[in-house]
């Protein structure tokens, strides 16, 4: 992490120096629990927390100074900067640091696949370049500016993930990051409590086009493509089903990944082994290949970036336990991602299929209908056993025609699963982040005891 300079922070934020001791800081932190010696502590205030209550804790752990909104603060011998709004100050600092950079910035947004696509892009560029990338899925109005504030200054490319919950969110992030390249993975039904409609989801994701010069979009998502028609910059398409600039051909899916021919514009087809299962991960890979090719990355680096990739935790992880094949896709869920996961379950099935499915949260007035439709489709697909987790899935469970169980929470669902699964089963575990579906496996006694750990 590069050093932060006091005078630059004041210039960026318009803040007032209440006391001056240290003029350089080892980095920026908003968490008093993890702050490191010499870092600048920025006290954020949220709905359930106020960083100003932990100023003393931050200093006790070696913070080199503080940015806060208090009229005064009694911390003698420390650098104190007062601002009117600490969140805006965080944005201002990140915007200022971004403005000092001339390296290309690639931003990734969309309903599904953002994190995996971002990591695949970073893996490709990382074969020969220093990459700054969003940590995990810290893709919001706090995580993204913190990522930018962590620049060393010698990065050669930035790969930033942008998430949204309401209209205008992507615009806020783009105003900070100023992306040169935009990747939009798809548009689907998610966070409808904030958006209200899928049209608003698309409108919000495509706010990114007001900033980027080049857009890379999924040609298999016709609804997304319709929204890009008026874009005045360069559009690169990728896809499997439809004509696109970047395509995958001769796809050979396997249990632990897929092989396919990668077709890039004007280049010879190259064979790829992607160590990620699922058709949607091929689309994520095509997005990464498209943007890398546009940036002049060699095909050999694209191939190496894919084949050295090791996946993203809690996203379509394949595990085996006592003859049971487990698909753990527990990070999040919405109707489109659930359908894709079920498709993968059916492809990998051996004998019985078991779906442990938690509520899909934040769907607003569409929630009841969405849950019922998913359950009906599972019945039509011939799923053998359904364990419904949470009130929404439980309410929709009446639509299921196979063997059905209900559970209040993920841990209870795991107890049910441990009673009914048997050798040869293929099990899918999925649900929204708030359902904490990773706890399903914690309830299996052998796992809890550490026997043959998954």
Residue ranges and their predicted role:
Residues 46-48, 312, 330-406, 432, ...:
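Active-site beta-alpha connecting loops in nucleotide-dependent enzymes
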Residues 108, 313-315, 434-440:
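ATP-dependent carboxylate/acyl-activation modules
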């Amino acid at each position: 992490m590069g050093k932060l300079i006091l005078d630059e922070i004041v210039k960026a934020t318009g803040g007032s120096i209440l006391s001056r001791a240290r003029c350089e800081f080892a980095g920026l932190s908003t968490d008093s629990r993890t702050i490191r010696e010499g870092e600048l502590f920025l006290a954020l205030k949220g709905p359930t927390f106020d960083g100003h209550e932990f100023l003393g804790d931050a200093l006790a752990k070696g913070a080199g100074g503080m940015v806060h909104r208090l009229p005064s603060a009694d911390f003698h011998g420390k650098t104190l900067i007062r601002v009117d709004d600490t969140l805006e100050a965080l944005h201002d600092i990140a915007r200022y640091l971004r403005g000092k950079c001339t390296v290309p910035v690639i931003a990734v947004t969309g309903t599904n696949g953002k994190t995996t696509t971002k990591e695949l892009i970073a893996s490709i560029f990382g074969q020969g370049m220093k990459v700054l990338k969003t940590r995990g899925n810290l893709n919001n109005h706090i995580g993204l500016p913190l990522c930018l504030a962590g620049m060393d200054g010698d990065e050669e490319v930035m790969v930033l993930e942008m998430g949204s919950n309401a209209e205008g969110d992507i615009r806020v992030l783009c105003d900070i990051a100023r992306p040169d390249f935009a990747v939009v993975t798809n548009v689907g039904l998610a966070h409808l409590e904030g958006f209200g409609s899928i049209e608003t989801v698309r409108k919000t994701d495509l706010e990114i086009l007001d900033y980027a010069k080049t857009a890379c979009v999924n040609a298999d998502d016709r609804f997304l493509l319709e929204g890009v028609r008026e874009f005045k910059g360069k559009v690169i398409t990728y896809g499997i089903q439809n004509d696109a600039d970047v395509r995958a051909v001769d796809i050979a899916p396997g249990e632990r990944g897929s092989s396919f021919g990668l077709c890039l514009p004007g280049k010879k087809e190259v064979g790829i082994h992607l160590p990620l299962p699922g058709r949607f991960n091929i689309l994520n890979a095509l997005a990464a290949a498209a943007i890398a090719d546009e940036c002049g990355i060699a095909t050999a680096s694209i191939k190496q970036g894919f084949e050295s990739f090791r996946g993203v935790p809690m996203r379509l992880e394949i595990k085996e336990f006592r003859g049971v094949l487990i698909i753990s896709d527990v990070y999040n869920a919405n109707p489109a991602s659930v359908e894709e996961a079920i498709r993968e379950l059916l492809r990998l099935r051996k004998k019985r299929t078991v779906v442990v499915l938690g509520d899909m949260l934040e769907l607003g007035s569409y929630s009841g209908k969405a849950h019922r439709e998913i359950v009906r489709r599972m019945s039509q697909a011939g799923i053998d056993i359904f364990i419904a987790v949470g009130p929404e899935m439980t309410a929709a469970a009446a639509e299921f025609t196979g063997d059905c169980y209900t559970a209040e929470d993920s841990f209870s669902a795991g107890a049910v699963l441990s009673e009914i699964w048997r050798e040869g089963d293929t099990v899918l575990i999925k649900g929204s982040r708030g359902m904490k579906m990773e706890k399903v496996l914690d309830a299996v006694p052998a796992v809890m005891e550490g026997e043959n750990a998954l």
